[in-house]
């Protein structure tokens, strides 16, 4: 029996969702002198942050302790261009090819399941974990990737780790950790029509700042969060790190259970019934204490875009850019080529990217397709649509979404991280402005000198059609053929 089965244990002291999962996984409690020892239920691995960790195991003659609780895929360095069966994938660099082939070798040596070329579940690691049902409520989940918090949408405690820690988990299935503080962000009320999960999380980060959640695990709560589907909840939790948080979590509910039921790695029969009973206890108790509380009115949220080079520079698409409050804000405005007092709406666009672990799931693609249907990408604009996994791509094609995108003039790509991190050959050119559904708008994130505006799939798709940043509500009505 793994520790995640014990999260429903009763306690006389009101506990938060985070407390319950943390307590159930402590192998050894922390002291003033030493961190606690935390058991890890699921270790996700990809090609970029794992090679050095496997090398350390080889140097020390160690084996992977729990290959059955380790799941690998290739995503960061993989090309998204089509290629024929039997051909070598068109890697951008020899280093990228070496990373993929090294992971293939390491996983084969240690008996780890790898969703590589030819797998029906290859894709972005934070898409395929939930898709397979490997991500489940009450688990502890780690990955050598900043956006591991995505899996917190299922009531799991999920966070990114460094390469050294990747080695620790491979060798021991445990991590030395001090317990973070807790924060609850409550988004109550009803959002306006067309407001997406991406708009909600950009509004949250704009409210609390890029360091507002530092040292904390955030629990997202409130009626607007509960109203989100699972893909939307994953989008919210995905960007917790952009607020400085260690992780983000949402209590599991009937929406969660319905989404998980029948997936490849979830329990079945009586074991499923028992799991549901356990998972229902994964809620913060009445009276549970949080170190910080933030309240946000859902009705106040508008379609959001960023104007600067940090994720907390989100504003409503038609709102004026605020006056700079610091040298970093002045620098950001200069880099972006924008002016305070003017809205981001109307800014000319060069490329649009719809994808990433934030927004590459089937509901994200449907949202973008609804805008693009019957329309054409503006002249001179390049639009890339990159599904999050082979399975997402197949479902989108079954629904005809790929034809909507290609008929509009967008490029329909193979799955991968793609332009989010721009290490696979998908990137912008110096000086170009990219409207992106990814999670980071740092200088050069999508290529040297590239300027990034973060947005929802609907807002990104609308920018591709209009040729400039625009409120997607202006294109919500179906186009006439």
Curated annotation (Swiss-Prot):
Q: Which UniProt keywords apply?
A: 4Fe-4S, Amino-acid biosynthesis, Branched-chain amino acid biosynthesis, Iron, Iron-sulfur, Leucine biosynthesis, Lyase, Metal-binding
InterPro entries per UniProt: 3-IsopropMal_deHydase_lsu (IPR004430), Acnase/IPM_dHydase_lsu_aba_1/3 (IPR015931), Acoase/IPM_deHydtase_lsu_aba (IPR001030), Aconitase_4Fe-4S_BS (IPR018136), Aconitase_4Fe-4S_dom (IPR036008), IPM_dehydratase_rel_enz (IPR050067), IPMI_cat (IPR033941)
Q: Name one GO molecular function term.
A: 4 iron, 4 sulfur cluster binding
* Cofactors (names): [4Fe-4S] cluster
Q: What is its EC number?
A: 4.2.1.33
Q: Which Gene3D superfamilies match?
A: Aconitase, domain 3
The GO biological-process annotations, alphabetized, read as:
L-leucine biosynthetic process
Tell me the pathway: Amino-acid biosynthesis; L-leucine biosynthesis; L-leucine from 3-methyl-2-oxobutanoate: step 2/4
Which residues take part in binding [4Fe-4S] cluster? 357, 417, 420
> Pfam families attached here?
Aconitase (PF00330)
Is Ribonucleoprotein among the key words of this record? no
Q: Which reaction does it catalyse?
A: (2R,3S)-3-isopropylmalate = (2S)-2-isopropylmalate
NCBIfam families to which the protein is assigned, alphabetical: leuC, PRK05478.1, PRK12466.1
Q: How does it assemble?
A: Heterodimer of LeuC and LeuD.
Family membership, please give it: Belongs to the aconitase/IPM isomerase family. LeuC type 1 subfamily.
Q: What does this protein do?
A: Catalyzes the isomerization between 2-isopropylmalate and 3-isopropylmalate, via the formation of 2-isopropylmaleate.
Please give the name of this protein: 3-isopropylmalate dehydratase large subunit
Native source organism of the sequence = Maricaulis maris (strain MCS10)
Gene from which this protein is expressed: leuC
């Amino acid at each position: 029996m793994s520790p995640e089965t014990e999260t429903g244990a009763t306690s006389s002291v009101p506990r938060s969702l985070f407390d319950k999962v943390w307590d159930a996984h402590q192998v050894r409690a922390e002291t003033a002198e030493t961190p606690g020892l935390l058991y890890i239920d699921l270790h996700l691995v990809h090609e970029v942050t794992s090679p050095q960790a496997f090398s350390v195991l080889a140097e020390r003659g160690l084996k992977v302790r729990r290959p059955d609780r380790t799941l690998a895929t290739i995503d960061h360095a993989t090309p998204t261009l089509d290629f024929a069966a039997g051909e070598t994938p068109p890697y951008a660099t020899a280093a990228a090819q070496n990373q993929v082939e090294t992971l293939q070798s390491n996983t084969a040596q240690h008996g780890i399941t790898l969703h590589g070329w030819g797998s029906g579940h290859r894709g972005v690691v934070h898409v395929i974990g939930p898709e397979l049902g490997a991500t489940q409520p009450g688990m502890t989940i780690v990955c050598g990737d900043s956006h591991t918090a995505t899996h917190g949408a299922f009531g799991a405690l999920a966070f990114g780790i460094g390469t050294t820690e990747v080695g620790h988990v491979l060798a021991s299935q445990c991590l030395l950790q001090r317990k973070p503080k807790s924060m609850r962000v409550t988004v109550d009320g009803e959002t306006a029509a067309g407001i997406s999960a991406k708009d909600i999380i950009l509004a949250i980060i704009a409210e609390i700042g890029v360091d507002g959640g530092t040292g904390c695990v955030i629990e997202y709560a409130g009626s607007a969060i509960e109203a989100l589907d699972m893909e939307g909840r994953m989008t919210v939790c995905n960007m917790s790190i952009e607020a400085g948080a260690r992780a983000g979590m949402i209590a599991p509910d009937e929406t969660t259970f319905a989404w998980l039921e029948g997936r490849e790695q979830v329990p079945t029969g009586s074991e499923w019934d028992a799991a549901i009973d356990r998972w229902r206890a994964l809620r913060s108790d009445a009276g549970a204490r949080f170190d910080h509380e933030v309240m946000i009115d859902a009705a106040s949220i508008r379609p959001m875009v960023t104007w600067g080079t940090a994720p907390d520079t989100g504003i409503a698409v038609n709102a004026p850019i605020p006056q700079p409050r610091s040298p970093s804000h002045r620098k950001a405005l200069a880099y972006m080529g924008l002016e305070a007092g003017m809205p981001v709406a109307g800014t000319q666009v060069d490329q649009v990217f719809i994808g990433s672990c934030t927004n590459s799931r089937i509901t994200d693609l449907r949202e973008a397709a609804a805008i693009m249907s019957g329309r054409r990408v503006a002249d001179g604009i390049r639009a890339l649509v990159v599904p999050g996994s082979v399975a997402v791509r197949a479902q989108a094609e079954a629904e005809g979404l790929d034809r909507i995108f290609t008929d509009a003039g967008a490029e329909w790509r193979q799955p991968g991280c793609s332009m989010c991190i721009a290490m696979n050959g998908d990137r912008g050119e110096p000086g170009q402005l990219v409207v992106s559904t990814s999670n980071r708008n740092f200088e050069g994130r999508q290529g040297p000198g590239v300027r990034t505006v973060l947005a929802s799939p609907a807002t990104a798709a609308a920018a591709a059609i209009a040729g400039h940043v625009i409120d997607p509500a202006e294109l919500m009505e179906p186009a006439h053929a």
